[in-house]
Amino acid sequence: MGKKLLQQRAGRGGINFRSPSWRRVGKAKIPNIEGEHIGKVIDIVHNPGTNAPLALIKLDDGTKFYVPSVQGLVVGQKIQIGKNAAISNGNIVEVGNVPEGTIISNIEKTRGDGGKFARSAGTYGVVVGKTGDKVLVKLSSEKIAQVSSNARAIVGVVAGGGVTEKPLLKAGNNYWKYKVKAKKWPHVRGVAMNAVSHPHGGGLHQSVSRPSTVSRNAPPGRKVGHIAARRTGRKEGA
């Protein structure tokens, strides 16, 4: 009898495949508040499982919340929140009041959702246009997102963008990297396994030796490889 595939084990929801959410510092989102406020950055902390540091902000009314920290933000810095907030690094402003060409991050899609775009380390969006009650924002992926003009965002680039420039150097560092994520590591190739462990395994060779395309309706133990692929391999003339 064959063994379960990696994705079958993950689907069961065991501890090795679950994200350790109990290690997180807390939710990082813009609070759903109205009016004008002055806040102070009281701490910048590491959030396990993410590369972007979180800034802990305390408002003048005593409210505390976390947001993804932007580059240049320091402990003790005063920030403004509200419709009339200045377009300055770290301030939380309404997207409709932001001039074209301004770099923003942690961008809400609709007001009150806390932030949906440009939240990971080193990412940002650029305001490229305004149409009625919508604002066009160019994201790091080159896609254009439409957000409400009263949605809010943080001025600046999310910190931690250089994390991928530092090499991991050894497998032990990669082990700890994946330890705080909902992923299983290391990932073993199917062709390197025994035939009992994977449909691509066995044969004393490093090739699939059969078509790797499988039906969308294949049973779970066979559904691996190029699933319902229209084509495989290089394009002609490429």
Curated annotation (Swiss-Prot):
Residues 199-238 are annotated as: Disordered. Residues 223-238 have a biased composition (Basic residues). InterPro entries: NA-bd_OB-fold, Rib_uL2_dom2, Ribosomal_uL2, Ribosomal_uL2_arc_euk, Ribosomal_uL2_C, Ribosomal_uL2_dom3, Ribosomal_uL2_RNA-bd_dom, Translation_prot_SH3-like_sf. Residues 206-216 have a biased composition (Polar residues). The keyword rRNA-binding applies. Pfam families: Ribosomal_L2, Ribosomal_L2_C. This is Large ribosomal subunit protein uL2. NCBIfam families: PRK09612.1. One of the primary rRNA binding proteins. Required for association of the 30S and 50S subunits to form the 70S ribosome, for tRNA binding and peptide bond formation. It has been suggested to have peptidyltransferase activity; this is somewhat controversial. Makes several contacts with the 16S rRNA in the 70S ribosome. One of its GO terms (biological process) is cytoplasmic translation. Belongs to the universal ribosomal protein uL2 family. The gene is rpl2. Keywords: Ribonucleoprotein, Ribosomal protein, RNA-binding, rRNA-binding. Part of the 50S ribosomal subunit. Forms a bridge to the 30S subunit in the 70S ribosome.
